[in-house]
A protein has these predicted regions:
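Cytosolic regulatory regions built on CNB/CRP/Popeye-like sensor folds
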Residues: 1-175
């Protein structure tokens, strides 16, 4: 059973992503993490995800909160920053196709940044619990997703190391 992303009451839960995909079948194809997967695999993954919407200025999550989901931006834009909203350091501006919160699938640790909706957003979310269900039900597919997440995080880390002298870097904008 798909577990909703209920940690954050500020997001409007659209429910199971599968009916949304029937109405708009190419939604997940927009997401960079799923572009290399066959359509049948994308359909399977969608059954383990929920859709959400959030209006401008909605805080999706805050730095320091324990994460329990990875989010994919289907529409809209998100500002990712550390520290104070006014004087903090911008880590990235993420738009359609980008993802954030990936580490929440892997570990139960505090979020490293705050994410705020800049332009009204639609998200597809994978909770840690749902990823564990995907792993139990479709291990080959879960390994593929995990490898892609690891590759994405590796690219971000590599870019961060290359641009270290520039401050906190714009590494979240890579995918």
């Amino acid at each position: 059973m798909v577990q909703p992303f209920n940690q954050f009451s500020t997001l409007e839960d659209l429910g199971d992503l599968a009916p949304i995909l029937r109405a708009r079948p190419n939604i997940l194809a927009l997401l960079k993490l799923f572009r290399s997967l066959p359509p049948d695999d994308v359909d399977i993954i969608a059954r383990y995800m929920h859709g959400y919407v959030a209006l401008e200025d909605t805080v999706v999550f805050r730095e320091g909160e324990i994460g329990d989901a990875m989010l994919f931006i289907v529409e809209g834009m998100v500002h990712v920053y550390r520290g104070d909203p006014v004087d903090g350091v911008t880590l990235g501006l993420l738009d359609r196709g980008k993802s954030f919160g990936e580490m929440a699938l892997i570990e139960n640790m505090p979020r490293s940044a705050t994410c705020v909706v800049l332009h009204d957003c639609m998200f597809a979310a994978m909770t840690r619990a749902n990823f564990e269900h995907l792993t139990a039900d479709h291990p080959r597919l879960a390994i593929t997703v995990l490898k892609d997440v690891a590759r994405m995080l590796s690219n971000r880390l590599r870019h961060a190391n290359e641009t270290r002298e520039g401050g906190m870097f714009d590494f979240l904008d890579l995918q």
